[in-house]
């Protein structure tokens, strides 16, 4: 799978641009503020319906316009597919895939799986468990068609349960919701656990390439003691949950644990090593997607030279090239990327003040 055409209108400082990307490595270079990262952001927006840089998606709309428009042609195994997205300043979003209106943004994610390696993506290890749950759930969503429905039901039931707790409801009023919660929580947990097991098999080899002298152990924690019956736990913790006004244990507390010896990886590794670990996680996830559903991710790699030294840039780019996936990578100086590749980039784009030029 690859993008063969990308149209961007009124997205940040890009008023209008059309790119014809190539399979393989697409290098986008330009000075800070030129708009090169905005191209990556536009691709992400088209696949996720939101930005990886701002929770307020209205901010990505060009100041002179009331809407942004993104359009892409995807080359898939079954043929070409066309995706269009329009976001209005009012917050309304309109999505079409092959001319048909799409109501759920999850359909975008299913159609256009994206992996991001940016300065912000390293928060996967530095922040709390939420970002690591999202990492697991991205893979589980693509790997198992039952996951999205179960995950949606977990969120729905958890919201209802927490509302009852805040209202001081008796356990007899909560018990029905607990039965639902247990059913969907166990389904979500089983899919997550299976996914992490599969990921681990690939991850070991990739971590060995990036960090050959480091033994990283990866494990999944479900959000409650695996030896404890979840229904019993919810009943036993009712008083505690009532006091706090929310559900203390459950799949919404799950985490991906990474350890070196007895220490969390965050405490045992240098910042540079942690960045390589995140790169390994992203590459493993993309490779697993290809194994499980025979679809490539599209990789968006922002400002690589400032994040990794020359040796590790070369290693990462080799790993990305070997996946066979389409990659978009940005840099201020194109030589920093070109010199790290064994073969020239498939295509190069120069960006200046929001204007994009292909370099022949």
From Swiss-Prot:
PROSITE patterns, A to Z: RECF_1, RECF_2
GO cellular component: cytoplasm
Top-rank lineage group of the source organism: Bacteria
Keyword Glycoprotein: no
Compartments, record wording: Cytoplasm
Binding site for ATP: 30-37
Example of a GO MF term: single-stranded DNA binding
GO process annotations (BP): DNA replication; DNA synthesis involved in DNA repair; double-strand break repair; SOS response
InterPro entries (alphabetical): DNA-binding_RecF, DNA-binding_RecF_CS, P-loop_NTPase, RecF/RecN/SMC_N, RecF_2
Keyword terms: ATP-binding, Cytoplasm, DNA damage, DNA repair, DNA replication, DNA-binding, Nucleotide-binding, SOS response
SUPFAM superfamilies (alphabetical): P-loop containing nucleoside triphosphate hydrolases
Function: The RecF protein is involved in DNA metabolism; it is required for DNA replication and normal SOS inducibility. RecF binds preferentially to single-stranded, linear DNA. It also seems to bind ATP.
Similarity field: Belongs to the RecF family.
Protein name: DNA replication and repair protein RecF
Organismal lineage: Bacteria, Pseudomonadati, Pseudomonadota, Gammaproteobacteria, Alteromonadales
Annotated gene: recF
